[in-house]
Structures are given as C-alpha cells and as structure tokens.
Amino acid sequence: MTGLESTPWAVIPAAGLGTRMAENAVLGCKELVVVNGKTMLEHTILELENAGIEQIVVVSSPNKPAIDKALVDRGVEIVHQAEPNGLVDAVKCARKKMGEGDCLVALPDVMFTNVNPSLELLSEFKGETLLTVVRADGAWATQLRDTGRITELQGHKIHRISSKNPDRAFPKGELRITGRAIWTEAFWDLKDDCEVSTLRKLASMGKLSASIVKTEYIDVGNSKGYRYAQSFFNR
C-alpha cells in the first residue's frame, strides 16, 4: 500500500550549464547526448512514462533552444528557468505550472541499467520524501564521485548525509543518493533553496526515506561516466 492518492507529476530539470561534460554536450546540452541510441532526455522521459506518469514537465533554459526543439510534439510540458539557479529553483519553476503536491524529480544525466527507479519510487512511496539509493559495490562504481553519500541508515530511514567531496572517488560499498526522488510538501515547508541542506534537515527530523535499488548506476554527467556508459552499451 503506497501513500499516493494519485500518480504524481514529474519534473526533469534540463536548464543547467552542464559544465562537468561540456566537451560531450550536443548543441550546448548535456541532455541531448546520445547513449544506446537515444538522448539522455528521451531515456528519462520514457522511464517516467513506463512508470505510469502522464504529466511530465521539462525545465529548460531560454539559452538552450535545442531542448525545446527536441521536444516538439513529444507530449510533455516545457517551462523555462531564466537563470541556472540550481535544482530547487528549477523545480519551483515547474511547480508554478503544475501547482503543489508530491512530485517525482528525475535528473536526465544519469542511467539505471537494470531497473526502472521511478516505478520503484512510486511502489514504495508512503508519504515521506523518498530518494532512490544504490550501493556502490561493483566495477561500475569507479566512475562515481564522492557526493550524495549516506552515512547513517536505519532500515529505510536516512539519518545522515555526508558533505560533497567531488574531487574524491566514491567509497566502495557505501550507499549513494542518485538522481531520482519524490519530494513532498514537507520538503518545501523548510523553505531552503539548497536541496542538500533540506534533505539533511528532513533526515534529522526522521522524515527522509530510501528506496534501495540493485542496479548499475551511471553518472553520464561527467566525462568518465559518459565513457563508461558508451562502453557498457557497446560491449
């Protein structure tokens, strides 16, 4: 039994500058990088559709017209984030279009090879902010950086998240937050413009849960992850 009265809408933030993989971006858009025959943006939309989500909002930028062009007749809503002011601001832009309520946040620069994480989130949601989490225990984890590391987990309750250390490799065997989540109104009640500090506050309040999935997780948003993704699907 889930905490969903109805399937939530989803948001795909695609307005960022993509500085981590500028060398591979297509027309200035990391979301249009092609992996396994489809753009990362299309992979993300299909994942959400296959999870049963019908209302999808893509947050683009007036400086990234190629995104809008790629989505012509695709059946998704498009809104623009005037400036690249971060993830929380991007989702706020989508909320202006869709209104309040639970929303599934899906970053378009990550891939899950063996599972539909959005479907798992919907099936496990019980009313609290819920994050898709993987254990970095395979060769695939070598392309990850030390961000989003969970340092205390009891059952499925997240109690502590580490600081970001993007210059370090992610520690093998540790749990990592990924680019999928359901944000509830409790997230917005904290009125914090930084998603990491908001998640930490929710964790300290006992209001943050983990959906742990067993899959290879690829961060295509960095050059090493991009190369790994290409080698994975071309092997």
Regions found by a protein language model. Give the residues of each.
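Catalytic-core segments of class I nucleotidyltransferases/pyrophosphorylases
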Residues: 104, 119-123, 153-235
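Conserved beta-loop-beta/alpha segment of the NTase-like Rossmann-fold superfamily
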Residues: 65-154
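Short, structured coil segments at secondary-structure junctions
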Residues: 28, 52, 73-74
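Short catalytic helix/loop segments, enriched in acidic residues and glycine
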Residues: 27-42
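N-terminal nucleotide-binding beta1-loop-alpha1 segment
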Residues: 1-26, 55, 207
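Residues in the short beta-alpha loop(s) of Rossmann-like NAD(P)-binding domains
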Residues: 38, 60-64
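Structural beta-sheet core signal
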Residues: 10-12, 57-58, 104-105, 130-132, ...
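A short, N-terminal amphipathic alpha-helix
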Residues: 38-55, 69-70
